Regions:
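Structural preference for solvent-exposed beta-strand-turn elements
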Residues: 1-396
Length: 396
């Protein structure tokens, strides 16, 4: 095999694949990537850990068809260090690969292509959503997925499209993140109900982050397929049933306090410094016009801060794991900012265009029933997405 490719193109595609390549594995070939020719003007790059596979197609000048299989990490490190010029690859005898870029020359040890696993093909009729919407779903739910390997049915996200609505739900048993959006046009006829593993979600977010097009997806009995602008991610499906999350969605939280997201986030960060390291407990006392936060450690002391809030009702103390609060506030802040990121363009009249970012304060609605029932948080006045975060309180 022999081909030439732009350094920037190769660096980008190798960067996407690094997340799924195994660095420490009992199957040595999984530390490698496969590069194959596709006609005269394109190559295909594949990396896998057998659970998640990423396949990228890239423009290249193919002088001789064939394939090479070399260390994913070593190749990526070399390509990142090269100048922004064309990179030339040539396969030699005994699987060795010579690569040149400018005055730099390298020889890499390769392995036989036959050792590399076969990749499932994407045969099902694909459904599609805007990649920005899918990425939005992932960014604001993935943090609530459990890290406990034994709870495999919770180690991913439930993704549903039905009745003209797209929905994603995650939980670790202590908290739950829920987001949905109404679909329009041809999207309304789509239908899917599946579990997407956590690793696949995180890799999808990287691929979809700066993409302006659609993401096509489908499934077979064992795999999920996601395709975005020439890049295909394949994931093994999770077996088992996701819990009935609707049972924990609060139906009668008739008390609500509304506060500024940034003010609360800063207060939680400060007060949590005095929380007990074992329980991570922080206490919120909701009263007329304010929410008081306090945390204490028997060995180190205590911290207290008051955040203004729109609230009229009974004084109610509620305990939380401060990390659960902060993760929601961090993600809701990113979510709100990206929603508002459609900045207005203003002309000065002489052809000069300046961009004005009109970000306003983001408000959070904190909805509860009493000290013991689950609390629901959401972005107030958000009409585009229905985003809810439900947390079980701690005993205080």
């Amino acid at each position: 095999m022999e081909f030439t490719i732009k350094q920037s193109t190769l660096k980008d595609e190798l960067g996407f694949i690094q997340g799924v390549v195994e660095r420490k594995t009992t199957i040595p070939v999984l530390a490698n990537i496969l590069i194959e020719s596709l006609g005269d003007n394109e190559i295909r790059i594949v990396g896998t850990d057998l659970d998640v596979t990423i396949r990228c197609d890239a423009e290249a000048v193919v002088e001789k068809a064939g394939s090479i299989c070399v260390s994913a990490r070593k190749l990526f490190d070399i390509v990142r260090a090269l100048d922004a010029e064309d990179v030339h690859f040539k396969k030699d005898d005994n699987e060795w690969v010579t690569m040149k870029c400018g005055r730099a020359k390298f020889r890499l040890a390769g392995v036989n292509r036959e050792q590399f696993p076969e990749i499932p093909s994407f045969k099902s009729t694909p459904l599609s959503l805007p990649a920005a919407t899918f990425n939005y779903f992932i960014q604001n739910t993935a943090f609530a997925i459990t890290n406990e390997v034994s709870r495999f049915t919770l180690s991913g996200a439930k993704f549903v499209i039905a009745d003209g609505i797209a929905r994603m739900v995650t939980t670790d048993g202590h908290r739950l993140a829920f987001i949905e959006q109404k679909l329009s046009g041809d999207e309304k006829t789509s239908a899917i109900d599946t579990l997407i593993p956590r690793k696949a979600l995180l890799e999808l977010a990287k691929i979809a982050r700066d993409t302006g097009g659609d993401i096509a997806f489908g499934e077979d009995q064992k795999h999920l397929f996601f395709e975005i602008e020439g890049r295909l991610l394949i994931s093994r499906t999770l077996t088992g049933s996701f819990p009935n999350y609707e049972l924990v969605m609060p139906k009668d939280n008739d008390l609500a306090a509304v506060f500024d997201l940034e003010e609360m986030r800063a207060a939680v960060r400060r007060v949590s410094l005095m929380a007990d390291d074992r329980t991570r407990s922080i206490r919120l006392i909701v009263r007329d016009g304010e929410i008081e936060l306090n945390a204490q450690s028997s060995e180190e002391g205590e911290g207290r801060e008051v955040v203004p809030a729109e609230y009229t009702g009974p004084e109610t103390p509620i305990g939380f794991n401060w990390q659960y609060l902060l993760e929601f506030l961090n993600n809701a802040g990113s979510m709100a900012n990206s929603t508002k990121a459609e900045a207005e363009k203003e002309s000065d009249g002489d052809g000069t265009v300046r961009v004005r970012d009109g970000n306003a304060a983001t408000r959070i609605s904190f909805e509860f029933k009493d000290s013991n029932a689950q609390t629901q948080m959401r972005i107030a006045d958000n009409s585009e997405y229905d985003y809810k975060y439900i947390v079980m309180p701690l005993r205080i």
